[in-house]
């Protein structure tokens, strides 16, 4: 977790060795993806303040990188203190959030950061460009991830590595996103995890 030397590389190495990130919504999902040796990175999209430490521990015990989507954890408010809570009370390697202030706080605390964006229109595209300069997340996740032309445009206009997420259901989607320049794809689809 400390951002120095080797530890700083852990999330980059995880997506480097396998560009498929398992996005999980239940303990059943966690058990399934923890059993797949090739899966290195896990996006945790569920839990609450009482269970998140156990959820993260299960992922870490399996030797995987645990990224918690802080916006989706019940009982945590969209404030910086929530990031501090995760850092102090869990073994999470980092956070995912749509909120730049939370990304900024996580970076200060030495956690990995994924700024998640929903690409609804050209304004959202402009916002990505502006905010990546201000917040400097480690990765930007764009949703939906099934728009290779848009992903290619984003990759051409930002320096931050891009993760494609949302609606990725088959090998064709994965290959299209990676060919467009995404460094990885995140998916809740169990078939995609086994690729």
Residue ranges and their predicted role:
Residues 3-66, 74-76, 91:
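Conserved N-terminal beta1-alpha1 strand-loop-helix module at the mouth
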Residues 21-25, 40-49, 67-75, 90-100, ...:
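Catalytic beta/alpha-barrel core
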Residues 44-47, 144-150, 166-195:
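Glycine-rich phosphate-binding active-site loops on the catalytic face of alpha/beta enzymes
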Residues 9-14, 56-63, 87, 103-110, ...:
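Surface-exposed amphipathic alpha-helices with a cationic face
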Residues 33, 99, 177:
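Conserved, mostly hydrophobic/aromatic
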Residues 36-42, 89-92, 108-114, 133-139, ...:
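Glycine-enriched alpha-helix->loop->beta-strand junction motifs that scaffold or abut catalytic
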Residues 23-35, 79-85, 123-131, 170-174:
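Short, acidic/polar
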């Amino acid at each position: 977790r400390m951002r120095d030397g080797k530890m700083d590389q852990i999330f980059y190495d995880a997506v480097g060795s396998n560009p498929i990130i398992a996005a999980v919504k239940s303990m059943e999902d966690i058990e399934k993806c923890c059993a797949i040796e090739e899966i290195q990175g896990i996006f945790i999209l569920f839990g609450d303040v009482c269970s998140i430490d156990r959820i993260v521990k299960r992922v870490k015990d399996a030797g995987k990188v645990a990224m918690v989507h802080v916006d989706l954890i019940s009982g945590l408010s969209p404030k910086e203190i929530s990031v501090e809570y995760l850092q102090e009370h869990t073994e999470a390697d980092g956070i995912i959030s749509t909120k730049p202030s939370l990304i900024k706080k996580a970076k200060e605390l030495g956690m990995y950061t994924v700024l998640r964006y929903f690409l609804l229109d050209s304004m959202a595209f402009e916002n990505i460009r502006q905010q990546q300069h201000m917040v400097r997340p480690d990765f930007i996740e764009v949703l939906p991830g099934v728009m290779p032309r848009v992903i290619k445009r984003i990759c051409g206009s930002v320096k931050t590595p891009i993760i494609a997420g949302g609606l990725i259901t088959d090998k064709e989607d994965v290959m299209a996103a990676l060919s467009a320049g995404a460094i990885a794809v995140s998916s809740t689809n169990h078939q995609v995890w086994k690729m």
